[in-house]
A protein has these predicted regions:
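A short SAM/SAH-binding and catalytic strip from SAM-dependent methyltransferases
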Residues: 113-128
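A short glycine-rich, Lys/Arg-flanked "PGG" loop and its adjoining helix->strand segment in the class I
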Residues: 131-143
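Class I SAM-dependent methyltransferase Rossmann-like catalytic core
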Residues: 4-41
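Short glycine-dipeptide loop
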Residues: 66-67, 141-147
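Conserved SAM/SAH-binding beta-strand->alpha-helix loop
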Residues: 76
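S-adenosyl-L-methionine
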Residues: 80-108
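Conserved class I S-adenosyl-L-methionine
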Residues: 43-52
Length: 148
């Protein structure tokens, strides 16, 4: 039963978000393994766009070095509260829409991310916002880094 509760909670948050959440179910272990299969850790900096309830976030923490940082950007306040329950000093939560955060001073200190994982629905963004997010993300990536 405990495994079902996060799935129901995610579904309810997605439905009540007014179109701000791009998925109605959490990422499965199969999806997480597929996304991360070619990523070798430990990494110093990882950025996650749209972490939702943190299912991928927890997997990303395993790829992070002990001194590393995982920056997660989430626009849904209910998901932010869930993310805040993850007890790991390496996680830094930024609440806001990626198209606003990516151009703000909150991102100025980030240099050379080894990995950027996006779970946001780019189709929800305006063309100019989508291009801006991709351009700014590319500028954040270290040499030989991944954006998935």
């Amino acid at each position: 039963m405990q495994a079902v509760i996060p799935k129901i909670q995610f579904f309810i948050n997605a439905i009540l978000s007014g179109g701000q959440v791009g998925a109605v179910s959490m990422s499965s272990n199969y999806v997480i393994k597929g996304v991360l299969k070619n990523i070798n850790g430990p990494l110093e900096t990882i950025i996650e766009y749209g972490p939702g309830n943190g299912i991928m976030t927890k997997a990303l923490l395993k790829l992070l070095s002990p001194q590393g940082k995982l920056i997660v950007i989430e626009s849904n306040p209910k998901f932010v509260k869930i993310l805040q329950k993850i007890k790991d000093s390496r996680i830094h939560i930024i609440e806001g829409k990626i198209q606003d955060v990516i151009t703000s001073e909150k991102m100025c200190y980030i240099k050379e991310a080894g990995l950027v994982v996006s779970s946001i629905p780019f189709s929800f963004l305006k063309t100019v916002e989508r291009e801006q997010v991709i351009e700014k993300t590319y500028a954040l990536l270290a040499c030989q880094a991944f954006f998935t």
